[in-house]
Amino acid sequence: MFDILAITAPIYVAIVLGYGLTRWGVFQKSDMRGFGTFVIKVSLPAMLFNALSNTQVKEIFQPIYLAAYALASLATLALALVWSMKFKRESFSLSSCYAMGMSCPNSGFVGYPVVLLSLGPFAGVVLALNMIVELFLIIPILMAWADAQEGKNSAVQVVWQTFNGMLKNTLLWGIVLGFLFSWFEIQLPQSLNRSVTLFAQASGALSLFVIGGSLVGLSVQGMGPRVSQIAFGKLILHPLIMLAVLLWVLPISDPVLRAAAILSCAMPMFGIYPILTQKHGHEGLSAAALLAATMASFFSLNGVLWLLKTQSI
């Protein structure tokens, strides 16, 4: 168990450090937005490009992994929508909030450092594969679903607007350029490659620091039942569905990819969760769920890592 804690402890120390220094006023919470923007728009794209451009195409192209990850995320999304709409009688937008919280893991800020420390340098490729599913499938579906009840835009319009926004997403361009450099076996000049590597190396620690600082001031008061349901769906249901997919639907022979798929689904929800739900007035619930899931993930992630190490999954 101590070797598992050796993997997760540095991650949560960085999160706690971000929280503590922001809580004590060394940094302002508004500073986290600038740090987060740097990570999302510069550091993570550099890391994705670096990881993909230095990996052979046959290692990047993992169609079974993509299909399994997409299927598990879609199944979690569907169950969340059915639960919230049919049993809880929630609105389209609030149901989308539930589903987004349960099916969209924090692949970049938390997932990448965890997978990197537990499975090694293949973490960059895993992050790219996860983001392809999240950016092109899960998020567009949920954004369209949230707007469906209002009738302001058709689902097709919402999806088109989402895809149009992705063209400005530097994460996407990091993936595309990294894949092209790998495909055509292009090498950057050594000096430029070192510069890209410098930016890439900043992603891990800074992303975790941002998560910690962003949690300052959040509260779950008065939202316990809803928050606990969303956190349970993200930390327990999503990885269990992924495990079921791997066992009975789309088995993955590579143990590293198999572990990466389960670990990815076991992450807390992504950091922009409150931002995406703000349009419909659900940012308070989203922020509370993000806080609860991030705190609880210390225990759930250690449990998942222990199971992956001790059981033949």
Report the location of each language-model feature.
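Alpha-helical transmembrane segments of multi-pass small-molecule/ion transporters
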Residues: M1-I313
